[in-house]
Regions:
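Hydrophobic beta-strand signal
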Residues: 44-45, 59
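Compositionally biased, charged N-terminal/linker segments
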Residues: 1-38, 120, 127-128
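Short, charged beta-turn/beta-strand-edge "cap" motif at the junction between a beta-strand
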Residues: 46-52
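Contiguous surface segments at macromolecular interaction interfaces
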Residues: 1-6, 67-128
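Conserved "cap/hinge" positions at secondary-structure junctions
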Residues: 47, 62-65
Length: 128
């Protein structure tokens, strides 16, 4: 899962761009999560601060490479796959016991986080 403030770069901005380099990550754990991504991985796109909801599915289109804004860090290229039929709010995620261990709840400041297949699938099922 990747998090972004929608007033800075929203799902709609992402879709309009067609793809984007996910740059500017300056946390070691989040950086390591970027480096672990492989081409084709599905990634949930979360609006943070405003909305606080999962809004779409993206895909890794280019694996980790030096972040052009600071080459000590890493970025990946993501492309949009599709919006969720219904956004899944943070309130709904917190209320779902199957998601009790999700990093979004446990480490809310982390901007790039892994999900298990079960967590990913559970969020998708909540979006229908």
């Amino acid at each position: 899962m990747v998090k972004q403030e929608p007033d800075k770069y929203s799902w709609d901005d992402f879709v309009a761009d067609g793809a984007t380099d996910w740059t500017g990550v300056r946390n070691f754990q989040a950086r390591n999560n970027l480096k672990a991504m492989v081409k084709g991985d599905k990634v949930l796109f979360y609006h943070s601060n405003v909305g606080k909801e999962v809004v779409g599915i993206a895909q890794v289109s280019k694996v980790a490479f030096p972040d052009p804004t600071d080459e000590k860090w890493f970025a990946v290229e993501l492309e949009p796959v599709k919006p969720l039929k219904k956004a899944v709010t943070l309130v709904d995620i917190k209320a779902n016991l199957a998601l009790a261990e999700i990093k979004l709840v446990r480490q809310s400041q982390l901007s790039v986080m892994p999900l298990t297949k079960d967590q990913f699938d559970e969020i998708l099922s909540m979006s229908k």
